[in-house]
Regions:
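A short alpha-helix capping/helix-coil boundary motif
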Residues: 7-11, 30-33, 59-62, 131-139, ...
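Active-site-proximal binding-pocket segments
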Residues: 190-364
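Glycine/tryptophan-enriched, flexible segments
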Residues: 88-90, 111-249, 352-391
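Trp/Phe/Arg-rich N-terminal binding region typifying the photolyase-homology
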Residues: 1-128, 215, 279, 391
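Charge-dense, low-complexity intrinsically disordered segments
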Residues: 13, 17-21, 166, 264, ...
Length: 391
């Protein structure tokens, strides 16, 4: 069963939102596999509670099985379905799936949540050694209802094709091996692009951890960061309500210049590495992680624009948008988050270019006019911006 929730879809102002298309194409692929077993997905476009109520009227529902979701709305939604199910004597079973360790499974020696990544990751790895990943194939245990059902179309859902190409699910062993040495260079095809699959559950976090073990500690740590930010979301729910992790940063005075924000959004800041990242995001729904740090630092520290503005723009554009990771990344850049970059660390876009795109291959791809007269002048002077933010 899959439910397209109007509460979520109605908030997507871009009717060519690629995430809806990705989900629908993934469901179609799964439906082809189900057809081989003479069954289909049951897909609804409705309020989730109402969809289950209709399902209960149509079938003899005895139990519901789903996986944990950690965001605020999802938790409230699942609680309402659980409460309804109990009135119908339907058991509601929910399981951990999208993380390796959740909630309070990784705590400090004082039984408190970690707010710094390094000790968290150390304890995470210790627990993995005590609780190794075990395969539980389900094919021989599955019991399918014979049926043939059709999926809704993008048009029925109120959306249209995006034109964005979606990454595959595969990852080469050689890429994982070379990840530490190659990961910071955006012109290289050195990252897996699996984040969208992790976000929507089309690849298993457990299978990726198994691929990383003994091959790349750095690649494994990137997966652990996901668990870490889910951990922060669970233990410090105020971050899901527009507040800084470090609440004193909520008193920060921002310039919030709307003209400069629009220039940042459109990749017209006059800083080629920043503009390349934003244009890549706008065109593909993806941005290299090193460049994400550069553009976020630029918005917050060069332009003194509230990190929440950037967080919201990324939430709209990123194909792999995940609230906890997006929020954590933006608060890291702003210095307001847990284990954040220190406030005095201000990325110099020019030096970042020299280090990570010295041949300008990435910039030439996305900002081909950067050496032409029609390319905009920098909207802010780096040294002056650095002095201003540190004042």
């Amino acid at each position: 069963i899959f439910i397209f929730d109007p509460h979520i879809l109605s908030k997507l102002s871009n009717k060519a939102d690629a995430r809806v298309e990705f989900i629908l194409s993934s469901l179609a692929f799964l439906n082809v596999q189900f057809a081989q077993r003479n069954t289909s997905l049951y897909v609804k476009h409705d309020d989730p509670l109402r969809a289950f109520q209709q399902l209960e009227e149509e079938f003899d529902v005895q139990a519901i099985f789903t996986n944990h979701d950690y965001e605020r709305y999802a938790d409230e939604r699942d609680s309402s379905i659980r409460n309804w199910a109990s009135t119908k004597q339907i058991t509601f079973n929910t399981f951990k799936d999208q993380v390796i360790f959740e909630k309070s499974e990784v705590l400090s020696g004082q039984n408190t949540p970690y707010t710094v990544f390094t000790p968290y990751s150390r304890r995470w790895k210790e627990r993995l050694g005590l609780h190794p990943i075990i395969q539980f194939p389900s094919e021989d245990l599955s019991n399918y209802l014979p049926c043939t059902l059709t999926l809704p179309t993008l048009d029925v859902l109120g959306f249209q094709a995006s034109g964005i190409a979606f990454p595959g699910k595969g990852v080469d062993h050689s890429l994982i091996q070379a990840y530490q040495a190659q990961r910071d260079f955006p012109a290289k095809d050195a990252t897996s692009h699996l984040s969208v699959h992790l976000r929507f559950g089309t690849v298993s976090i457990r299978s990726l951890v198994q691929k990383a073990l003994g091959v790349s500690e750095t690649w494994l740590n990137e997966l652990i960061w996901r668990d870490f930010y889910f951990n922060i979301l669970h233990h410090f729910p105020h971050v899901s309500q527009g507040s800084a992790f470090r609440k004193e940063y909520d008193r920060m005075e921002w310039r919030n210049n709307e003209v400069e924000f629009e220039a940042w959004c459109q990749g017209q800041t006059g800083y080629p590495i920043v503009d390349a990242g934003m244009r890549e995001l706008n065109s593909t729904g993806f941005m290299h992680n090193r460049v994400r740090m550069i553009v976020a630092s630029f918005l917050v520290k060069h332009l003194l624009i509230d990190w929440r503005w950037g967080e919201a723009y990324f939430a709209e554009k990123l194909l792999d948008f995940d609230f906890s990771a997006n929020n954590g990344g933006w608060q890291w850049a702003a210095g307001s988050g847990c284990d954040a970059a220190p406030y005095f660390r201000v990325f110099n876009p020019t030096l970042q270019t020299q280090k990570f795109d010295k041949d300008l291959a990435y910039i030439r791809k996305w900002v081909p006019e950067f050496q032409e007269l029609n390319y905009p002048q920098p909207i802010v002077n780096h040294e002056q911006a650095r002095v201003r933010v540190l004042a």
